[in-house]
Amino acid sequence: MKIVLISGLSGSGKSVALRQMEDSGYFCVDNLPLEMLPALVSYHIERADETELAVSVDVRSGIDIGQAREQIASLRGLGHRVEVLFVEAEEAVLVRRFSETRRGHPLSNQDMTLLESLKKEREWLFPLKEIAYCIDTSKMNAQQLRHAVRQWLKVERTGLLVILEFFGFKYGVPNNADFMFDMRSLPNPYYDPELRPYTGMDKPVWDYLDGQPLVQEMVDDIERFVTHWLPRLEDESRSYVTVAIGCTGGQHRSVYVVEKLARRLKGRYELLIRHRQAQNLSDR
């Protein structure tokens, strides 16, 4: 049976993610105490229900991270496929969202401010984030989060999942990258008026960057680095590795390099391509 545990920071969009799981055909349970998870799985099996499970766990249920990881290992040992989805956002964004909704944080009390509660929650959940697929919703609306969840669900993962993410430095850097590479020193198609409207997926930009020796050298170097270290991460039983590639605007060079790497790594690793800012690529 496939079981998805959804966790993350309060205000980051866990409820939206859980609703998308339900719309995708999962049997969903919100805020389940972890000690009840084995009983839920057993009940599901006894009913001969083939529906996959999605369970939301967070600080409201008094989650014990050590217990959570033990439960995951135990369920996997019984042959279940257990995935962890972690939803987060930048603290400034979360503060704004709480202010707009006027809701209280689950950890807030007279002794802790909202910001202190958010920091404590982030520290508390970090060990769970380490083994999870992470979605940063700082620059997402609900529809975009739903799309990101659907894209993740499409991946049938049996081993290490390599997430190739492109972004623009002028919009900020991703906070969940395991490796980050900077493409801003490479020739920039943006300064060619004919190439500016295109993206790194379009043939005119592709042809231009294909002809740049520095660009090819950079791709070669990143491929060598990544393929050298990924086996080490697999040995540590990592489920996900995020490789972030950035350029100034996240439109030309970083997109091209991610697509080029994906072609080279295809067949060796399970891949998911993800972007942060290029909204015109959201339906790729």
UniProtKB/Swiss-Prot annotation:
GTP binds at residues 58-61. InterPro entries: P-loop_NTPase, RapZ-like, RapZ-like_N, RapZ_C. ATP binds at residues 8-15. Pfam families: PapZ_C (PF22740), RapZ-like_N (PF03668). Coiled coil: none annotated. One of its GO terms (molecular function) is ATP binding. Keywords: ATP-binding, GTP-binding, Nucleotide-binding. It comes from the Bacteria. SUPFAM superfamilies: P-loop containing nucleoside triphosphate hydrolases. NCBIfam families: PRK05416.1. Belongs to the RapZ-like family. Displays ATPase and GTPase activities. This is Nucleotide-binding protein NMC0691. It comes from Neisseria meningitidis serogroup C / serotype 2a (strain ATCC 700532 / DSM 15464 / FAM18).
